């Protein structure tokens, strides 16, 4: 198991797909990382040399990933709620934030239906 950014990368997968198991790295960024490290994206992670894995580690360390990114996103949401802006109020009430309709849909965000008490 190769360990990059505190995450165990599955060794039986291609380099690009394995890098996407890190929170904050998608396919495009994984391809950019492989290109800048001069690593073939189709090579499986178990076939990489230790120095190639080390270059991947240093390249991934340049980005905000995993715990730091999660903390940053949660702090952004908390800031919106503290400001009391529209988006913050929608987060606080557990409603859709980006203008979706709520009369008939949004069950995932609103939770299960609550019966009306007479």
Curated annotation (Swiss-Prot):
GO cellular component: cytosol; small ribosomal subunit
Keywords: Ribonucleoprotein, Ribosomal protein, RNA-binding, rRNA-binding, tRNA-binding
Region spans: Disordered: 91-118
Gene3D superfamilies registered for this protein in UniProt: 1.10.8.50, 30s ribosomal protein s13, domain 2
Top-level taxon: Bacteria
PROSITE patterns given in the database record: RIBOSOMAL_S13_1, RIBOSOMAL_S13_2
Subunit structure: Part of the 30S ribosomal subunit. Forms a loose heterodimer with protein S19. Forms two bridges to the 50S subunit in the 70S ribosome.
Protein name (record): Small ribosomal subunit protein uS13
